[in-house]
Curated annotation (Swiss-Prot):
Cofactor details (free text): Binds 2 magnesium ions per tetramer.
Residues given in the record as Mg(2+) binding sites: 470, 476, 479-480
Residues in FDX-ACB domain copies: 717-808
One GO term (biological process): phenylalanyl-tRNA aminoacylation
Domain B5: 404-492
Protein's name according to its UniProt entry: Phenylalanine--tRNA ligase beta subunit
Family membership noted in the UniProt record: Belongs to the phenylalanyl-tRNA synthetase beta subunit family. Type 1 subfamily.
Gene Ontology MF term list: ATP binding; magnesium ion binding; phenylalanine-tRNA ligase activity; tRNA binding
Cofactor(s) in the UniProt record: Mg(2+)
EC number: 6.1.1.20
Record note on quaternary structure: Tetramer of two alpha and two beta subunits.
PANTHER family assigned to the protein according to its UniProt record, in alphabetical order: PHENYLALANINE--TRNA LIGASE BETA SUBUNIT (PTHR10947:SF0), PHENYLALANYL-TRNA SYNTHETASE BETA CHAIN AND LEUCINE-RICH REPEAT-CONTAINING PROTEIN 47 (PTHR10947)
Length: 809
């Protein structure tokens, strides 16, 4: 929002510099930038004075004008009819950038010879300066214009550019900014109540107004001016519109735009003679209706749009844009002015649907008080009578079907201190309310003292000005008190208590960590509903129906119970993806399951469930792609838990829905935390899955009690390593984990890797052979063969003693 400083000072005289003014408003919550409207716009353009005007020797319609521009005199050839010696003009030297008066494009002024006489510059019209479309003659400046001053400085205007927040629609006008600044500097602005002199007949005999939707239009006011003369606006009015970023059109339209910028209330002017029925109806659009708006575009309307109509035609799109059929033109003799209050939501929807954002709709969208409509209407009528003449009909048409009271807010003065952290009466809320233009009175509501509002004298009822539609509660009022008093005046108080140390729950961090790891492994995350069906759970667990929590009002039979496992959604998703021929799938889900407990309570552990199926790698012509197997899933589990600083063990399990012999329980110490295995053929068939699927499900709520994601620094070993192979014969009941745990206890052993297992004729029937790669390395010196041999002998003795293993010959 752009506000000319000179205009603002007409309502609030102040000696503050533009920078100080901008700083005060910015600190109060409205960011302000100071601009010069024409700074650097006209290089080489100066205020000049015509010294002589002589006839052109070779052309009757041209004259020779000698111009003094402060640093010398130049002769200019021009055809302007209004050149007169002594006039102050705008003189452009060679190199100036102006607007071509014929095509409206920018041009660089060059030396020219016109009918045999050299012209060294130009005396400029308003159009050539980009001020308006006027091109009939040159721009004549006031007699006190200083010769030699840059035109950008003389014609320029200090502009305050406001960055408005959505709730401050009251600052979209000069008077609103004057009120805001006045409150900040404790000076009431001079804003008088406008009125006009009526000399015509009663307006009620001239027009009838009917509102058919009182929710979308709460007030409609109108005035009538007859016998006006449409023409150009005065220079001062045009300049202010241009400074605010608006284009002058004619005196009537310019007056309505001027008042909108002045008071914030959009107005619209109709050609009264084009309203044949003299009956205006405010109603919603009907399906299929169309309107050609002022921009010449035919627009299709919908029933949620509000219209201004006659009984037989549409004449305007309420709050957005007028219709072409009642446009004010040069032939207009009588004008009907509209100033109304429309529903902000309706205007926003209409402007958005038609992609027709206008200055009017921007203001209506923020919400306007019903009290503002007649104020702006009187001011616009007054201004048009001044600049366009005519006679105003007596009175105003004012239709307001539902009478409204002004909003009020009850505020406990002690609450101001509590919210702002003050001690004692730091701020005088009533005095600040007066600076804002608000009224107030004592308030007493019996029985409210117990809620902490203080004594009876502590309560006040505040009545915000009609222009402040954003003040709706006591918190809004407290914000105003702090804003106007100054946030920087609120004292900084040390905390009277130490800030308690709050332990961060480990689970969210663990889940983020696991997501990163699984994404790195190529997994995709699934997020499913927490609801499922008994039938789905029965399919997952091979007919065994686990106890589950039933939903009292399920949306469907497929969402009748809370899930007791994450597997159903993963299996269903896998089957759906395989139908679309997706191969090499890796899916996981992190989420809660819901297990019933005694006394109508439930356990809600966080779980991680994942599955792999299909090819383990992408197809490659040089080798066949292998599918996932049980040990791929086991390796992923081991990697995941090891990244959390945990060592996982595996034990024989008998989990329903998994293949016997191809499943294992996951243990941390002696605590079961999950299950791992291959989907049983029966379960896979129930989901339409035809390939091997391997899954694991881990109870994270249990796992995190042993987890740590702290990273430890490990120095890179500078000494060489030694590799040895070890082949053992041992009972089939001995597991690989038992062997590797014993070997890993020796300090010099850095890695143990099983590379072969044999069961057959070369060993006894109840025996098996396991072969290992062992990596030896010292942190302090280079190992010798004797060092490694000694450790190998110790390993064999331990294995023989604890497992009965012997060296395979």
């Amino acid at each position: 929002m752009k506000i000319p400083l000179k205009w603002l000072k007409e309502y609030l005289p102040t000696d503050m510099s533009p920078a100080e003014l901008a700083e005060r408003m910015t600190m109060a919550g409205t960011e302000v930038t100071v601009l010069n409207s024409r700074k650097d716009k006209w290089p080489n353009v100066y205020v000049g004075q015509i010294m002589e005007v002589n006839r052109h020797p070779n052309a009757d319609r041209l004259v020779l004008v000698k111009v003094d521009w402060g640093q010398g005199q130049e002769t200019v050839v021009t055809g302007a009819p209004n050149c007169k010696a002594g006039d102050k003009v705008v003189f452009a030297r060679t190199g100036a950038v102006l607007i071509d008066g014929h095509n409206g494009k920018e041009m660089v002024l060059k030396p020219a010879v016109l009918r045999g006489v050299e012209s060294c510059g130009m005396v400029c019209s308003e159009r050539e300066l980009g001020l308006s479309d006027e091109h009939e003659g040159i721009l004549i400046l006031p007699a006190d214009a200083p010769v030699g001053m840059l035109a950008s400085e003389y014609l320029g205007e200090i502009i305050l550019d406001l960055e408005l927040t959505p709730n401050r629609g009251d600052l979209m006008c000069v008077t609103g900014v004057a009120r805001e600044l006045g409150a900040l500097i404790d000076r009431l602005p001079s804003i008088s109540t406008p009125d006009f002199k009526a000399t015509g007949k009663d307006i009620k005999d001239k027009i009838n107004i009917e509102i058919k939707n009182t929710k979308l239009c709460t007030r409609y006011t109108a005035s009538l001016i007859e016998g006006i003369k449409i023409g150009e606006s005065p220079d001062w009015l045009k300049e202010r519109l241009i400074a605010c970023g608006m284009r002058p059109i004619n005196n009537v339209v310019d007056a309505t735009n001027y008042v909108m910028l002045e008071f914030g209330q959009p107005l619209h002017s109709f050609d009264y003679d084009q309203i044949k029925s003299k009956h205006i109806i405010v109603r919603p659009a009907a399906e299929g209706e169309v309107l050609t708006t002022l921009d010449g575009v035919e627009r299709k309307l919908s029933p949620d749009m509000l219209l201004i109509t006659e009984p037989d035609k549409i004449i305007a799109l309420a709050g957005v844009m007028g219709g072409e059929n009642t446009e004010v033109t040069e032939k207009t003799a009588s004008v009907l002015l509209e100033s109304a209050t429309f529903d902000k939501h309706s205007i926003r929807r209409t402007a958005k649907a038609l992609k027709l954002q206008s200055e009017a709709s921007a203001r209506f969208e923020k919400g306007l008080s019903f009290e503002l409509a007649p104020v702006a209407l009187k001011r616009a009528t007054q201004l048009i009578l001044e600049i366009a003449g005519g006679q105003a009909a007596s009175g105003l048409m004012d239709v307001m079907p539902v009478k409204k009271d002004r909003n009020s807010v009850v505020l406990s003065l002690s609450k101001v201190n509590r919210v702002l952290g003050l001690e004692g009466e730091k701020f005088d809320s009533c005095k600040i309310a007066k600076r804002l233009g608000f009224a107030w009175m004592p308030e007493y509501v019996p029985g409210m003292e117990e809620f902490g509002y203080g004594s009876v004298d502590d309560k006040m009822r505040f009545f915000p000005g009609y222009w402040r539609m954003d003040i709706e509660s006591d918190i809004d009022m407290i914000e105003e008190v702090a804003r106007i008093a100054g946030y920087d005046t609120i004292p900084c108080l040390p905390l009277d208590k130490a800030i308690p140390k709050i332990e961060t729950p480990p689970l969210p961090g663990i889940k983020r960590f696991l997501r990163q790891i699984l994404s790195g492994y190529g997994f995709q995350e699934l997020i499913s509903y927490s609801f499922t069906s008994r039938e789905m759970l029965s399919r997952v667990f091979s007919g065994a129906e686990p106890e589950c929590l039933a939903i009292s009002n399920p949306m469907s039979s497929e969402q009748e119970v809370m899930r007791t496992s994450l597997r159903p959604a993963l299996y269903a998703s896998l089957a759906a993806n395989r139908r679309f021929e997706k191969n090499g799938l890796r899916l996981y889900e992190l989420g809660r399951i819901y297990l019933p407990k005694e006394n109508n309570k439930q356990d809600e552990p966080e779980m991680l469930c994942a599955l792999i199926a299909g090819s383990a790698s992408e197809a490659w012509w040089q080798r066949n792609t292998a599918g996932f197997d049980f040990f791929d899933a086991k390796g992923i589990v081991e990697s995941l838990v090891s990244r959390l600083g945990i060592a996982a063990d595996f034990a024989v399990s008998d989990e329903p829905g998994l293949t016997p012999g191809y499943q294992a329980g996951i243990l941390v110490g002696d605590m079961p935390v999950g299950v791992l295995g291959q989907l049983s053929p029966q379960t896979a068939d129930k989901f339409g899955i035809t390939e091997p699927v391997y899954m694991f499900e881990i109870n994270l709520s249990k796992l995190i009690t042993r987890a740590t994601v702290r990273r430890k620094f490990t120095q890179i070993n500078r000494f060489p390593s030694v590799e040895r192979d070890l082949a053992l014969v041992l009972d089939r009941s001995i597991t690989n984990r038992q062997v590797t745990d014993i070997i890993s206890e020796f300090d010099l052993v850095k890695n143990v890797e099983l590379f072969d297992m044999y069961q057959g004729k070369q060993v006894a029937e109840d025996k098996k052979s396991l072969a290992y790669h062992l990596l030896f390395q010292s942190d302090t010196h280079t190992l010798k063969d004797a060092d490694v041999d000694s450790v190998m002998n110790q390993i064999l003795k331990r294995l023989n003693t604890e497992t009965g293993a012997v060296l395979r010959s």
